[in-house]
Amino acid sequence: MLWFSGVGALAERYCRRSPGITCCVLLLLNCSGVPMSLASSFLTGSVAKCENEGEVLQIPFITDNPCIMCVCLNKEVTCKREKCPVLSRDCALAIKQRGACCEQCKGCTYEGNTYNSSFKWQSPAEPCVLRQCQEGVVTESGVRCVVHCKNPLEHLGMCCPTCPGCVFEGVQYQEGEEFQPEGSKCTKCSCTGGRTQCVREVCPILSCPQHLSHIPPGQCCPKCLGQRKVFDLPFGSCLFRSDVYDNGSSFLYDNCTACTCRDSTVVCKRKCSHPGGCDQGQEGCCEECLLRVPPEDIKVCKFGNKIFQDGEMWSSINCTICACVKGRTECRNKQCIPISSCPQGKILNRKGCCPICTEKPGVCTVFGDPHYNTFDGRTFNFQGTCQYVLTKDCSSPASPFQVLVKNDARRTRSFSWTKSVELVLGESRVSLQQHLTVRWNGSRIALPCRAPHFHIDLDGYLLKVTTKAGLEISWDGDSFVEVMAAPHLKGKLCGLCGNYNGHKRDDLIGGDGNFKFDVDDFAESWRVESNEFCNRPQRKPVPELCQGTVKVKLRAHRECQKLKSWEFQTCHSTVDYATFYRSCVTDMCECPVHKNCYCESFLAYTRACQREGIKVHWEPQQNCAATQCKHGAVYDTCGPGCIKTCDNWNEIGPCNKPCVAGCHCPANLVLHKGRCIKPVLCPQR
């Protein structure tokens, strides 16, 4: 019997052409449990036997595929497909040789040994010569020393001389301590035996073209951008930059470096790669390869308030890359790889100089009656009227942060609304309240507010809190909440927003760690224990989408119908509006007279479209923004901290309280019973 495991059409073709053999194929199933490929027919025949246990067999049409290998196992032919590993993101050159199944990150072959990319080594016979492999290129160079004193001392068995003392740039370093001089990412120094020794990092030669390289922030050496793939290179030949060199051919990389293609590896040697002085004929290379560099010969560049060493590169403003060349600063525009779209699960980030694809952050949205959409995309409704954990870090016993929401019935029979949002960061408690009012540890504050671990500011019609922990909270001052979690928090969160692990099926894990089959049980398990009485009479069930009168139903559908209008049409093909429409109708049917309850669904749909890079033409400022204060008040991010009322408007004296954000009465009006009125209209005392 001939067994196949997931080899698809090749197995089917071979079995159909071999009527005398029984093929037992292990079928692959799709997500619905339906067999793929060979599910359409049953193949019959006799058993394929073999004699030599463990022998690798060649079977036409099957083993022609380099990923499939057939062996004799228990006297029967068994075939298996090789599974290819995922290449590292740092792999800049992937190769696939003829006859091989999987792609590999290009390594190096040198003197009969094989080395992985980024590996560095030194030979005992040549301890002062450094060799390093980088995507098929071996760079051979001498250890580069940096000397900062006039009379350095050379030591037997050491590549670099040392300078007396361990005081460097005015700082006293301890024995064994390693440090970097200010402004030099490429130089490392150490304090050994009461003396200082400094070594400058030698950067590997890259196989990619120069315009496809960049220096990552905070690093010394450039790296290749993206990943190149090469198939079926001629045996022994080398790919370097955009050219292919035959085995044994040589070329000059620059005036000081000669390269040779040896057995598919480019070996590049610096001309002054050994300790000692330079010959007269190599004066042009001495600046690059001298092991001893006296201080007076070191040419540096000053750019802004920083000092850069000769040969050092850095990113400047306006997306330019600069280099220090023999004491002169040279800058050029940064070359970017054109990117127009990203694979599923990633977004195009245009914040830097070059667009890059980054993992999408997790987004949890709460809006309306309220409707919850978790980080992993599960939607549910819950009308509790207490305070609940929206999300927190569950990866450690003492959660470094948590976001709480407090719900309010707002005089409805069956529904509740989000009344306020509270962010707890260590000892700090930030409360986002109605009409975009903000309290920090109980005191109202003005905007913007910048603290060590968070920043609060008004972003258009939304209040935005950005934390160093990786959370970003948006609040509209009414009942819309959006929590954005950075990708590094994946799998660490819990609460009403779910666990952010990429699977919506396990989002209903309660506060006790057990999965809940009922949404209400799940939500109540995240209730914050307090002495406050927050229960209300038993909620009336809502069997229908809308239980109001005909007039109420007509108003609900009339307002929510705008989701289908031209203002949102550009997004319909990308983000389905049906869920938001149902939520809108539900909210409108239990909507208090003074509220525009469609706003939350419209805002949630608009934000979902914006996250997909689609601009819609709806703006909430006219009817929905919380900055549109009522009863004569106006919104101000830094309004007076002392409220003028009918009881105190004529009192003389300055206000010593700091300004606060929120709705305030204009200077010529006073607050009375929630309304701004003229002082002459105040009731007599």
From Swiss-Prot:
Glycans are attached at N116, N247, N255, N318, N441. Disulfide bonds join C364-C497, C386-C534. Coiled coil: none annotated. Gene3D superfamilies: 6.20.200.20, Complement Module, domain 1, Laminin. InterPro entries: Kielin_Chordin-BMP_Reg, Ser_inhib-like_sf, TIL_dom, VWF/SSPO/ZAN-like_Cys-rich_dom, VWF_dom, VWF_type-D. Keywords: Disease variant, Disulfide bond, Glycoprotein, Repeat, Secreted, Signal. The keyword Flavoprotein does not apply. Its main location: secreted. Residues 1-39 form the signal peptide. The keyword Disulfide bond applies. Highly expressed in lung, and brain and also in primary chondrocytes. GO terms for cellular component: extracellular matrix; extracellular space. Residues 362-535 form the VWFD domain. It is found in: Secreted. Residues 629-682 form the TIL domain. Residues 50-105, 108-163, 164-225, 238-289, 299-358 form the VWFC domain. GO terms for biological process: blood vessel development; blood vessel endothelial cell proliferation involved in sprouting angiogenesis; BMP signaling pathway; endothelial cell activation; inner ear development; negative regulation of BMP signaling pathway; positive regulation of ERK1 and ERK2 cascade; positive regulation of SMAD protein signal transduction. Inhibitor of bone morphogenetic protein (BMP) function, it may regulate BMP responsiveness of osteoblasts and chondrocytes. Interacts with BMP4. It is linked to Diaphanospondylodysostosis: A rare, recessively inherited, perinatal lethal skeletal disorder. The primary skeletal characteristics of the phenotype include a small chest, abnormal vertebral segmentation, and posterior rib gaps containing incompletely differentiated mesenchymal tissue. Consistent craniofacial features include ocular hypertelorism, epicanthal folds, a depressed nasal bridge with a short nose, and low-set ears. The most commonly described extraskeletal finding is nephroblastomatosis with cystic kidneys, but other visceral findings have been described in some cases. This is BMP-binding endothelial regulator protein. It comes from Homo sapiens.
